[in-house]
Design a protein with these regions (language model features):
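A short glycine-centered flexible hinge/capping loop motif at secondary-structure junctions
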Residues: 198-202, 395-399, 436
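Terminal intrinsically disordered/low-complexity segments used for targeting and assembly
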Residues: 2-70, 226-268, 432-452
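Small/polar, glycine/serine/threonine/aspartate-rich low-complexity segments that form flexible
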Residues: 50-60, 101-133, 137, 247-261, ...
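Periplasmic alpha-helical coiled-coil/stalk elements that build and connect Gram-negative outer-membrane
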Residues: 3, 134, 143, 150-268, ...
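C-terminal hydrophobic structural anchor segments
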Residues: 370-399
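Transmembrane beta-barrel architecture of outer-membrane proteins
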Residues: 66, 119, 165, 210, ...
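A glycine-/polar-enriched beta->alpha junction
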Residues: 69, 73-80, 86-101, 114, ...
Length: 452
């Protein structure tokens, strides 16, 4: 009896040892924003087998690619990525488990009558239907886990893309803002000189009106640019997990090279872009669900054995089989639902694929047009700046008045601002094209693992 009690205790301890335990997970009580760039995560994991990890230097101007990496490493919205991956892995684990066998035990104590012994009965059964669908269920769960990973990678790409575009806009926006302030300074100086001349009676008051109009337009443009810069900085700080007041230097953008031929890149685009890969995996998972639903048409079937003893000490035992009679429910609804889901995913994938191909070709056409516009605008800006330099020399020699010089200088600044705007549009389009082609970003997730 003592050995029996020890055995029961050991078995109970073994069962409890394999059980999960509860641990509290308190919520945060305040923000977790970094107050400076150096406080961010800066180590980029290896993105290819055998490649070393690298650390982003935050003590020098950042290029737009590094800004994108910092956003992926530190974006508050991406902090839930490890949790989503853990949920998918847990679902896969659950689908990988076979159903537990069912056991039943009953005991009937002898209370009176002609019986000689207590009665008891025991049975053990296993659901065969769950075993039949085990392979398809596990494969579907594995594909769903891979789909989650591809979706999470696409989220990283979108965050990196948004950060790179913001960094590009901030760089060119600052260049335009500096030029706009220079133009405003020139106009302000010219307005003051004309005002002095009109007060002295050397110029008619009508000469002041166009200058005031130009100055008001320049003030509005500078104010609008300043507000846009502030909004872009706040958006970028939010992506980086920084306090909204943090500012840092952004290096001149090095734009990705344009592909010489789109055909080979479009040919394997479905295997390279994470969102298309995720849709393919989702479709394959839905296809396995269809197979599982078809197998589920067969009635539930459980087999096992039972053993019993009655009050007269007569013992019996033998196999058992329990099954449903598929008179009403033959899993028709589940089969129809899984087929409809598979068809929906098929159509969604085709729609996304068509959109991807159309977007790539459209962006390529825009780049060709913008490249020509940038060349023309750069030539015009250089010509205007050359004329402005000649005007300054003429003014220094006394061969030109202040008003004419200001006109030449503001025209040169306007031309350069127009060229910068076109360069920014070209850069945005080129960066967008690289992502649409599935290029320029890692093919593996780089979000840091969850802290234990």
């Amino acid at each position: 009896m003592k050995q029996l009690r020890l055995g029961i205790a050991a078995g109970a301890a073994a069962l409890l040892g394999g059980c999960a335990l509860y641990h509290p997970l308190p919520l945060a009580h305040g923000p977790d924003l970094a107050g400076r760039l150096a406080a961010l995560r800066t180590e980029v994991p290896a993105t290819r087998p055998g490649a070393p990890a690298r650390r982003i230097a935050t003590d020098s101007p950042l290029d737009i690619d590094d800004v994108g990496f910092l956003a992926v490493l530190n974006d508050p919205e991406l902090r839930s990525e490890p949790g989503q991956a853990d949920v998918a892995q847990a679902s896969l684990l659950q689908s990988s488990l076979l159903p537990n066998p069912a056991a039943s035990v009953s005991y009937g104590a002898l209370l009176g009558g002609e019986g000689t012994t207590p009665a008891w009965a025991a049975s053990l059964t296993e659901d065969l239907k769950s075993i039949l669908t085990y392979h398809t269920r596990k494969k579907s769960a594995r594909l769903q886990t891979q789909q989650v990973n591809a979706d999470l990678l696409w989220q990283e790409w979108q965050i990196a893309q948004k950060a790179r575009l913001l960094a590009l806009d901030l760089y060119y926006g600052q260049q335009s803002l500096d030029l706009g302030r220079r133009e405003l300074g020139l106009l302000d100086r010219e307005v003051k000189e004309v005002q002095a001349a009109t007060q002295a009676g050397n110029l008619d008051l009508s000469a002041l009106a166009p200058l005031l109009t130009a100055k008001a337009a320049a003030e509005q443009a500078v104010a609008s640019l300043g507000l846009t810069q502030m909004q872009n900085w706040q958006a970028l700080d939010a992506l980086l997990g920084l306090d909204p007041q943090v500012r840092f230097a952004i290096a001149a953008p090095a734009l990705p090279p344009l592909p010489a031929d789109l055909a080979p890149l479009l040919a394997d685009l479905p295997d390279r872009r994470p969102d298309l890969v995720a849709l393919q995996l989702g479709y394959r998972s839905a296809d396995e669900d269809v197979r599982s639903a078809i197998i589920g048409q067969f009635p539930a079937f459980a087999v096992g054995g039972q053993w019993a003893q009655d009050n007269t000490d007569v013992r019996s035992g033998g196999p058992t089989a329990t099954f449903d009679l598929p008179v009403f429910d033959r899993n028709q609804g589940q089969v129809r639902q899984t087929r409809a889901t598979r068809l929906l995913l098929n159509e969604q994938y085709q729609s996304r694929l068509d959109d991807a191909f159309g977007t790539v070709k459209g962006l390529d056409a825009q780049i060709r047009r913008l490249s020509e516009d940038v060349r023309n605008a750069s030539v015009a800006a250089a010509a205007a700046e050359k004329i402005s330099a000649s005007a300054r020399r003429a003014y220094a020699q006394g061969n030109m008045d202040q008003r004419s010089l200001a006109d030449f200088e503001t025209t040169a600044l306007d031309r350069r601002i127009e060229a910068l705007a076109l360069e920014r549009s070209l850069g945005e389009t080129q960066i967008t094209l690289t992502v649409e082609l599935g290029l320029g970003l890692p093919q593996t997730r780089i979000v840091p693992a969850r802290k234990s």
